[in-house]
Amino acid sequence: MSITDVLSADDIAAALQECQDPDTFEPQKFFQTSGLSKMSASQVKDVFRFIDNDQSGYLDEEELKFFLQKFESGARELTESETKSLMAAADNDGDGKIGADEFQEMVHS
């Protein structure tokens, strides 16, 4: 699966443009601009599986660091503060990782 199978390349480019500078990544803005927030729950979970590098069923901080690069290989890494903020926004049960349901809830919140 390629991310452009479910999201428009133009929307992805626009979303990445908005957060190209360090410490400018805002999850909800990214989800809105990329079109992710308009997708169904099952489509969002498909994107989650694409982002889940090790197919563990969870996203950890290491995977979140490379979140933007899953949308475009040349995109920057998230900063440590952006990574921790993204984790805090989605990790509802406080286990230090984001499951598919938590990811979907964050995207649609």
Swiss-Prot record:
Origin: domain of life: Eukaryota
Tissue expression as described in the entry: Abundant in the organ of Corti.
GO cellular component terms listed in the entry, alphabetical order: cytoplasm
Keyword Acetylation: yes
Residues where N-acetylserine is found: S2
Residues holding Ca(2+) 2: D91, D93, D95, K97, E102
PROSITE patterns found in the cross-reference section: EF_HAND_1, EF_HAND_2
UniProt GO molecular function: calcium ion binding
Residues where Ca(2+) 1 binds: D52, D54, S56, Y58, E63
Entry annotated with the keyword Acetylation: yes
EF-hand domain mapped to chain residues: 39-74, 78-109
Its biological purpose: Has some calmodulin-like activity with respect to enzyme activation and growth regulation. Binds two calcium ions.
Assigned protein family: Belongs to the parvalbumin family.
Descriptive protein name: Oncomodulin
